[in-house]
Amino acid sequence: MHILLTRPIEDCSEMIIKFQSLGHKVSHLPLLSIKKILHEEIDLSKFKGIIFTSSNAVRFLNLNGLDKNIKCFCVGNATEKEARGHGFSNTIAAEGNVLNLKELILQNFDKTEGKLIYVSGETISVDLDNQLQNEGYDVKRLINYETVHNEKFDNDFINKLKLDMPDMVYVYSQNSASSLLKFIKFNQLESLWMSTNLMCIGEKTSAKLNEIKWKKIFLFNPGEEEFLLYKI
């Protein structure tokens, strides 16, 4: 099976190796680049819990002054793995869904325990900080990275893709979906995806690509990528 992955290499290198070990052909089309955002200095010692909704949020955070034994809430297993790699020991992970993450926080962190810091990228799909504030929590959102659309792609890669279109393509965000649509249109690939299954996180992401004719569209949570191989 031919699989197209679209995340930055640091977010999908393990998946590339895994899929190749299963005998699949894997192509890599990084649609977005991740860049650190400089932010104001924050005294992290005053927070009693930390929330991460992506691995990138962990990578770009200056951890000086932060007690790594505090409760660390992660949106999914990959983010939790990244957090543990940076020394966090008291981690709690949802199943790749921000709404599930909110419920985990409500169940495992009492608002009387103190302040929460929510570390994220510039663009988010769910305003988790506002939702928690509406529940009475004291939450500070810290934006420490942004996503930038890649605009230059290797012509040799594009020509090879036209000759061997993927059976599956994984898209992880509305930003990525918009970038993929732009890539498809710019390279006049609109009519070539009718035998490709589109795998998206959430309906809002898949909606960005509805004008392209796909074989089927599947919605999934992070961590379910391998399971989806057996659904088509």
Residue ranges and their predicted role:
Residues M1-I232:
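Signature of uroporphyrinogen-III synthase
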